[in-house]
Every structure is written in C-alpha cells, then in structure tokens.
Amino acid sequence: MPDRPEIVCICGSTRFVDEMRAANRDLTFAGVIVVAPGEADELITNEQKTALDALHLRKIDLADRVLVVNPGGYVGESTSREIAYAHATGKSISFTDPV
C-alpha cells in the first residue's frame, strides 16, 4: 500500500445519490479515501446551494482524481462546472458511464 491512500472526489447529480453512495462504498472498501458531495434530506436555499457548490470545488482541490457518477451518460449543469474546474486544475477525471 502506498504511503497515502488515493483520494477520490465523487461528483454527480443529486438525482443519483444512491449510485454515488454505492461508488463511495466500493471505493472505500478498495482502500480509497472518498470525498463526496454533502447530502440534505430537506430542501436547501439558493444560498446554501451556492455555499455547497463552492465547498465541493475545495473538495476537488483535495482529491487526486475525480469520479463522475453519471448513469446513462447524464451530466447536469453543476456537475459540468465541477468537471470543467477539475480539468482546469489538472485533475484526472473518470466517468461511471460513457458521456
């Protein structure tokens, strides 16, 4: 095992929360440190969404690479911004489904 486990940031639409949880579980059992989107059971305000979006970019900064959970190839607006940010910062990006 390397000195430090790989760190992967999961990105994806909140409509795929179950799939992101499964990816988190699988990566964790594979010895990977996973940084995932925050979750809320209730509706959030626009202000909270803006804050969470900014926080997720910082999570991407912490990661060695990004895994986009995109069943059926779906990538929404927020996820597209995260992919562009990850690309601009030189992160390796992989997808669960073809885009």
Where do the language-model regions lie?
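Conserved catalytic or regulatory cores that recognize and/or transform ribose-phosphate-containing ligands
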Residues: 1-99
